[in-house]
Curated annotation (Swiss-Prot):
SMART domains: acidPPc. One of its GO terms (molecular function) is acid phosphatase activity. The keyword Transferase does not apply. This is Non-specific acid phosphatase. Residues 1-20 form the signal peptide. The lineage of its organism: Bacteria, Pseudomonadati, Pseudomonadota, Gammaproteobacteria, Enterobacterales. GO terms for cellular component: outer membrane-bounded periplasmic space. It comes from the Bacteria. The keyword DNA-binding does not apply. Belongs to the class A bacterial acid phosphatase family.
């Protein structure tokens, strides 16, 4: 993947980070596995998968205003503060810059690796129109729409990030793997419900997240960081009890 793809996505990265702290990525954009190469093209208009895409979109749009729609809106915010709030009860431990600084930075780093670098080449190449644009509807987060219109729909970066994050946190806290896998799946599906992505975008994003997970396993800096994350999330002082957080048994 060429470095110019980073320029294309840099405004998105900056907009999502609310902390001024800089986190060094585990690899460069050029060292990402090229998603344009390994992903098939998104479904064409005459493809049965495209009919399924439309069915899934309208199924999500039909529950607009419901609790699940509101969850999709919450999932759309990939700021580190919001992701920590979502995944802390699922992993069963605190996630904040004071008690778990390595985990906090890992959340940021995985967004860059999975949400942006890993998806960039396919997004740039296909520049697929998003469903809310095609149908002239609002998404669950209208404030994101101007940015999304300029960003290819296929594959879903949010989904790649959520999948990657669930897998990495499962490495650190394997006893919470089933809960993390479920929440990671829902995080991706939220993009269809929100109206920001087609189902095939999300399906592809899940695979991109898995590919990036495999890529990270080969990088010593990631392994070193993961060891610290594992230590933080299993520190008895950072573990959540049922009394601390009623959602622990999610």
């Amino acid at each position: 993947m060429k470095s110019r793809y980073l320029v294309f996505f840099l405004p998105l990265i900056v907009a999502k980070y609310t902390s001024a702290e800089t986190v060094q990525p585990f690899h460069s954009p050029e060292e990402s596995v090229n998603s344009q190469f390994y992903l098939p093209p998104p479904p064409g208009n005459d493809d049965p998968a495209y009919r399924y895409d439309k069915e899934a979109y309208f199924k999500g749009y039909a529950i607009k205003g419901s609790p699940r729609w509101k969850q999709a809106a919450e999932d759309a915010d990939v700021s580190v503060e919001n992701i920590a709030r979502i995944f802390s009860p699922v992993v069963g431990a605190k996630i904040n810059p004071k008690d778990t600084p390595e985990t906090w930075n890992m959340l940021k780093n995985l967004l860059t690796m999975g949400g942006y670098y890993a998806t960039a080449s396919a997004k740039k190449y296909y520049m697929r129109t998003r469903p809310f644009v095609l149908f002239n509807h609002s998404t669950c987060r209208p404030e994101d729409e101007n940015t999304l219109r300029k960003n290819g729909s296929y594959p879903s970066g949010h989904t790649a990030y959520g999948t990657l994050l669930a897998l990495v946190l499962s490495e650190a806290r394997p006893e919470r793997a089933q809960e993390l896998a479920r929440r990671g799946w829902e995080f991706g599906q939220s993009r269809v419900i929100c109206g920001a992505h087609w189902q095939s975008d999300v399906d592809a994003g899940r695979y991109v997240g898995a590919v990036e997970f495999a890529r990270l396993q080969t990088i010593p800096a990631f392994q070193k960081s993961l060891a610290k994350v594992r230590e933080e999330l299993n520190d008895k002082n950072n573990l959540l009890s049922k009394e601390d957080h009623p959602k622990l048994n999610y």
